[in-house]
């Protein structure tokens, strides 16, 4: 009975020993499991770090790929811009060819019109000549008929006198033959009477001679008249030739003006395009800088938030498992989240304010454009008013012309007598000389104006050449900038090669990491095999524990050996982990070095940008200096030209005065010759008068002698008283006739004296006027000499100034050459910018399509984000459930023995991991919210960009319409100018005809034209200012386009970053789910183990 009890006691002891060993083995197993879990957790953390590194590498690769894609896109855009610039240049060349063809056609038509006008003018001149010749011949015929009539009358009178004398002679002869006896006594009387008859015949012959002289004088005067008429005709022909020359000059001036206007329009269009491009570039750069600043602010906020989140995570790790601290941290996070939301709202408000400011700027610019249009309309109305005024003046001039024509006809009708005709011709000659002088002065004025216009043309051509030089210098500067860009691209390529080398190093490290992971996996497999064997031994031990104690001891030893081996393997794994951590640190250091290199590259790019801006500022300063020097040069040149023009005018005036003096001298000579002729005629007339008086005295003496003879013969001839009475009666008749003739001759002589007195008075007045004109000419000559001296002094001063200006100009020319080189570079830059503009326009279209694609991608990302948020919520719910389960397990483990304290530590570590997962989930939520807000911002920015793009397109369309309208207006203006020129030619013809009596009107017209030219110059300056404003607007628009491009590229980059972040978060979520599944499986295992232990205890108690 005792032996079985002892056996039972021994068995109980053995069972107790076995239980103790079992408990020890269980503790060892738990330790090994805890160690295994630690290793698994470390392995998970290493896998996470590996994934993070892989994601970072992928992000860097994506960024590099994006950078390469951007470089490719920039190259493509550059090529597209170059193609577009080529197309634009081809269009410009085609348009220039079209303009040249139109101008050539216009010139041909104008030449044809001028030829037709010349033919018409020639026909009109020939008609006028024919009419004048007809009138001259008619006048000659009338004069000849009148002269013939006077001669016939004189001949009839002489024949009558001769007949009467013959009859008297025949009667005397009959009386003498009848009374020969009585004749002897009267023979003496007869001889005396015959002598008287001879004297009368001599006097008649003398009268005939006087008449012949008078006729000769008359013919001379008629010849002089004809000469004066021919001179008048020559003057009229000269006048017509002058009119034709004036017309030709006006036509040439109109052609030159049209050419200048066309060239100015082309230059202004090019300047508009350049300024529009520059304005666009500036606006885009401003928007880029603003967006960069905003981006920098957002990145700063993001970095601050990341730091705060890291600090919060460190605080959470330090706080451990305190729920109150978690709640406080959650509240803090919520407050920070609210702060971030407020900051985001403020940023959105700032963006809206900037958008409103941009809209206001756009509205102000539109208002300015409207004001400019109103100003142009006002100028147009002013021009129309001036046109109407000119039409009114033309109508007045035509009416005056008609009146002058009527007055001329009346004057021609009123020409009656020969003397009046002479006086009128003299007055007309004076008027024609005055008109000729006026015409010569006007001609000199027109020539000077023509010279000034030619000089202006030359100045404009020099300006065009200067602009072309500036263009070449700009092109050279653009080439230099292009070289700098190529150098930067080379440096970027070098950085890209360095990145590729870093990638290669990363790939090598990745391969090493994969090899170490494979080794780790092999160790894990060995551990799993050991665990499986332990489980097998445990099951065997549980079934055969009572029977096989010895085998259990052997197995225990083997397990201990295997545990030592596992510990050694774990130590080796730890060593490998440390080596992996070192490799990780090395990779992180390399990554930091790469980031530093990237920052250096960015800083180098920024420094290059700053250098470029400084270079642009230097170029602008040099441009300003060049413009100032050019303005000074132009001012000095203008002064020299004005002085030269004044000198030329004075020389012309001096030459004109000399010519006028020569003409006056010639006229004086002619007048002196005429005076000498008239004095000769007067002396001849006086001689004739003396001879007539002598004849009268002789006749009186003969009369007295005849009376004496008659008284002596009274006594002898009383029986013949009847006959003598009859003879006396006849003698009294002859006496009466003779006295009547003498009276007529006296009257003729008095008339001749009066006419000669009149001519002498007129000659005296002309001599007085000539003396006055000589005095005035001498005075003018003295004035001109004084003015010439002053002008020579001024010229010497001007020459000095010109010499100084040339010296300064040479100094400036050296600077200008340097500036021209820079300007050529800038011209090359402008060409590149034009090419980039063309590519940017195409790029805009591509960006529009890419924006649509990005919108679709954003919609997809929003859907994915919503799914991710839903999955995050589910994960958080799971994590909360696991947290509750873990807390229940911790309570159960507290009830268990104190030996399971290590399990509590492990559970606490798992709780910490869960908390980390919660923190990561919260971070992911915050990141998702940030991404959502950033997506909203990007959507707003994209919508704003679309609106701005639409506005830009509308403005570009409006500008294109305005340009088309301006071109149409220019074409219409060309037609109107042709019509105006034709009407102007007619007006000038009328004015030249009216300028015979209207000098003052012509001067007023010239003043009006000068005002018109001033107004046109003012208008052209206003047009230039408007064009400059348009150019600035276009430059600003180009800048905006560039900024929009950069914004779109940045949006693409941000979208890629968000996609990479989304992938990272999704990967983190997958890892958290895997960890949660692992924790659930561990909990299930613990539950099954606890159930098995409870069942075994129940079995043992039973």
Swiss-Prot record:
Domain of life per record: Eukaryota
GO molecular function: actin filament binding; ATP binding; microfilament motor activity
Coiled-coil stretches noted in the UniProt entry, renumbered to this chain: 1-1102
GO cellular component: cytoplasm; myofibril; myosin filament; myosin II complex
SUPFAM superfamilies per record: Myosin rod fragments
InterPro entries (UniProt xref): Myosin_tail, XRCC4-like_C
Keywords: Actin-binding, ATP-binding, Coiled coil, Cytoplasm, Motor protein, Muscle protein, Myosin, Nucleotide-binding, Thick filament
Subcellular location, record wording: Cytoplasm, Myofibril
Pfam families documented for this protein: Myosin_tail_1 (PF01576)
Region entry Disordered, spans: 1070-1102
GO BP, one annotated term: atrial cardiac muscle cell development
Signal sequence segment: none
Predominant location category: cytoplasm
Tissue expression remark: Ventricular muscle and traces levels in the atrium. Also transient expression in skeletal muscle during fetal development and regeneration following freeze injury.
Keyword Transport: no
Role according to the record: Muscle contraction.
Domain remark text: The rodlike tail sequence is highly repetitive, showing cycles of a 28-residue repeat pattern composed of 4 heptapeptides, characteristic for alpha-helical coiled coils. Limited proteolysis of myosin heavy chain produces 1 light meromyosin (LMM) and 1 heavy meromyosin (HMM). HMM can be further cleaved into 2 globular subfragments (S1) and 1 rod-shaped subfragment (S2).
Subunit field text: Muscle myosin is a hexameric protein that consists of 2 heavy chain subunits (MHC), 2 alkali light chain subunits (MLC) and 2 regulatory light chain subunits (MLC-2).
Protein name: Myosin heavy chain, cardiac muscle isoform
Organism (species): Gallus gallus (Chicken)
């Amino acid at each position: 009975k005792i032996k079985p009890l002892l056996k039972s006691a021994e068995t109980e002891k053995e069972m107790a020993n076995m239980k103790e060993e079992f408990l020890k083995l269980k503790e060892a197993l738990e330790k090994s499991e805890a160690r295994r879990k630690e290793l698994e957790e470390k392995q998970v953390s290493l896998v996470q770090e590996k994934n993070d590194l892989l994601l970072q590498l992928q992000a860097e690769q994506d960024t590099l790929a994006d950078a390469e894609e951007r470089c490719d896109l920039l190259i493509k855009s550059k090529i597209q811009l170059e193609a577009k610039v080529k197309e634009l240049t081809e269009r410009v060349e085609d348009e220039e060819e079209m303009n040249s063809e139109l101008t050539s056609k216009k010139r041909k038509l104008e030449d044809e019109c001028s030829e037709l006008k010349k033919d018409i003018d020639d026909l009109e001149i020939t008609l006028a000549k024919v009419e004048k010749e007809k009138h001259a011949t008619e006048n000659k015929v009338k004069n000849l008929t009148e002269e013939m009539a006077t001669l016939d009358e004189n001949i009839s009178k002489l024949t009558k006198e001769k007949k009467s004398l013959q009859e008297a002679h025949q009667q005397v002869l009959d009386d003498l033959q009848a009374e020969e006896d009585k004749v002897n006594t009267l023979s003496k009387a007869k001889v005396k009477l015959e002598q008287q008859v001879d004297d009368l015949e001599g006097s008649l012959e003398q009268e005939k001679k006087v008449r012949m002289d008078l006729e000769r004088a008359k013919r001379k005067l008629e010849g002089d008249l004809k000469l004066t008429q021919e001179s008048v005709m020559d003057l009229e022909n000269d006048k017509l030739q002058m009119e034709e020359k004036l017309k030709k000059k006006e036509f040439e001036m109109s052609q030159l003006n049209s050419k200048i206007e066309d060239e100015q329009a082309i230059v202004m269009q090019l300047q508009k395009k350049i300024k529009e491009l520059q304005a666009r570039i500036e606006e885009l750069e401003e928007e880029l800088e603003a967006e960069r600043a905003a981006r920098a602010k957002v990145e700063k906020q993001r970095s601050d938030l990341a730091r705060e989140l890291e600090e919060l995570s460190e605080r959470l790790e330090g706080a451990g498992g305190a729920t109150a601290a978690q709640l406080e941290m959650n509240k803090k996070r919520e407050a920070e989240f609210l702060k971030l939301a407020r900051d985001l709202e403020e940023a959105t408000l700032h963006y809206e304010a900037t958008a409103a400011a941009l809209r206001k700027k756009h509205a102000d610019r539109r208002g300015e454009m409207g004001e400019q249009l109103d100003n142009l309309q006002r100028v147009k109305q002013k021009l129309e008013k001036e046109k109407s005024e000119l039409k009114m003046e033309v109508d007045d001039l035509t009416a005056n012309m008609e009146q002058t024509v009527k007055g001329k006809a009346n004057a021609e009708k009123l020409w009656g007598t020969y003397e009046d005709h002479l006086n009128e011709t003299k007055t007309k000659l004076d008027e024609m000389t005055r008109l000729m002088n006026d015409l010569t002065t006007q001609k000199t004025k027109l020539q000077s104006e023509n010279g000034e216009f030619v000089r202006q043309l030359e100045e404009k051509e020099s300006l065009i050449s200067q602009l072309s030089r500036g263009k070449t210098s700009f092109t050279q500067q653009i080439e230099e900038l292009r070289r700098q860009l190529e150098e930067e691209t080379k440096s970027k390529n070098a950085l890209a090669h360095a990145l590729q080398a870093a990638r290669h190093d990363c790939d090598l490290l990745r391969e090493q990491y994969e090899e170490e992971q494979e080794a780790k996996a092999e160790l894990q497999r060995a551990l799993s095999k050991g665990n499986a064997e332990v489980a097998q031994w445990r099951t065997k031990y549980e079934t055969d524990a009572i029977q096989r104690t010895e085998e259990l001891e052997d197995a225990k030893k083997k397990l201990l050996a295997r545990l030592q081996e596992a510990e050694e393997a774990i130590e080796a794994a730890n060593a490998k982990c440390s080596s992996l951590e070192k490799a990780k640190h090395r990779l992180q250091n390399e990554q930091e070095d790469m980031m530093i290199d990237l920052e250096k590259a960015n800083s180098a790019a920024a420094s290059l940008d700053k250098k470029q801006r400084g270079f642009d500022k230097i170029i602008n300063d040099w441009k300003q200096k060049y413009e100032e020097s050019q303005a000074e040069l132009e001012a000095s040149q203008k002064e020299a030209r004005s002085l030269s023009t004044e000198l030329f005018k004075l020389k012309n005036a001096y030459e004109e005065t000399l010519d006028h003096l020569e003409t006056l001298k010639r006229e004086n000579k002619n007048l002196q010759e005429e005076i000498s002729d008239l004095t000769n005629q007067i002396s001849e007339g006086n001689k004739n008068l003396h001879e007539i008086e002598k004849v009268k005295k002789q006749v009186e003496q003969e009369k007295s002698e005849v009376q004496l003879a008659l008284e002596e013969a009274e006594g002898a001839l009383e029986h013949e008283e009847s006959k003598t009475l009859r003879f006396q009666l006849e003698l009294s008749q002859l006496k009466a006739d003779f006295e009547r003739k003498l009276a007529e001759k006296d009257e003729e002589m008095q008339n001749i004296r009066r006419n000669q007195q009149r001519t002498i008075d007129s000659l005296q007045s002309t001599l007085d006027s000539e003396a006055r004109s000589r005095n005035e000419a001498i005075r003018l000559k003295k004035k001109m000499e004084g003015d010439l001296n002053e002008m020579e002094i001024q010229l010497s001063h001007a020459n000095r100034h010109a010499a100084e200006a040339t010296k300064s100009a040479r100094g400036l020319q050296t600077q200008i050459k340097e500036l021209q080189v820079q300007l050529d570079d800038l011209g090359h830059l402008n060409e590149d910018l034009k090419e980039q503009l063309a590519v940017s326009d195409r790029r805009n279209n591509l960006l529009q399509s890419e924006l649509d694609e990005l919108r679709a991608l954003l919609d997809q990302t929003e859907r994915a984000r919503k799914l991710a948020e839903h999955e995050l919520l589910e994960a958080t719910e799971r994590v909360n459930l696991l947290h509750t389960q873990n807390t229940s397990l911790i309570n159960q483990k507290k009830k268990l023995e104190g030996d399971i304290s290590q399990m509590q530590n492990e559970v606490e570590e798992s709780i910490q991991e869960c908390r980390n997962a919660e923190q990561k989930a919260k971070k992911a939520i915050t990141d998702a919210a940030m991404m959502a807000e950033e997506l909203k911002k990007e959507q707003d920015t994209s919508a704003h960009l679309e609106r701005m793009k639409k506005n830009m397109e509308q403005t570009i369309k409006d500008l294109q319409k305005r340009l088309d309208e301006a071109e149409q207006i220019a074409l219409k203006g060309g037609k109107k100018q042709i019509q105006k020129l034709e009407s102007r030619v007619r007006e000038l013809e009328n004015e030249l005809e009216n300028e015979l009596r209207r000098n003052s009107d012509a001067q007023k017209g010239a003043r009006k034209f000068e005002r018109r030219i001033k107004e046109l110059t003012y208008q052209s300056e206003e047009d230039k200012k408007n064009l400059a404003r348009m150019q600035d607007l276009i430059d600003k628009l180009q800048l905006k386009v560039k900024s929009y491009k950069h914004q779109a590229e940045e949006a693409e980059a941000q979208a890629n970053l968000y996609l990479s972040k989304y992938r990272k978060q999704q990967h983190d979520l997958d890892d958290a789910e895997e960890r949660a599944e692992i924790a659930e499986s561990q909990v299930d295992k613990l539950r099954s183990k606890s159930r098995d232990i409870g069942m075994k205890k129940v079995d043992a108690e039973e």
